[in-house]
Amino acid sequence: MIIKKAFKEDLETAAYLFDLYRQFYDKRSDIESAKDFLSERMENHESEIFLAFSADDDLKNKGMGFVQLYPSFTSVGMKRIWILNDLFVHENFRKQGVAEALIARSKDLAIETNAKGIILETHFSNTAAQKLYDKIGFEKDDEHFYYYLKV
């Protein structure tokens, strides 16, 4: 498996996976908007996207999954933090260590940028993801509540 940072030349693969990810959350397919959204994130350096590719020659150009992280900061800790906002593995490649590899690369990014850590959220019902996060070493935050203001 090859994990690489996504650049403009990877936009088609990234958008394809991103569109499938959104469909997983019951959004309609919109590949052009997916391209626009990811292209803007890349151009403005607003996120880091990593793609997983198979090392198998027959599948070399087929994206297996992706992770997208957004930078933020902890004012109290006076350091960068990364928000692991999107993680998706194509159904044909699940249970093959793809998610673990993408999270490992995310952890490397946090270390490279001297970040305090990585935060994420997941739905209460997503027990498969919760098991993975626990296995990798993420800890549930039991000190804070998170609120959302719809505008």
Regions from the PLM with identified roles:
Residues 100, 124-143, 149:
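Conserved active-site alpha-helix within GNAT-family acetyltransferase domains
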Residues 51, 60-71:
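Conserved beta-strand in the GNAT
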Residues 18-40:
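Conserved GNAT-fold acetyl-CoA-binding loop/helix
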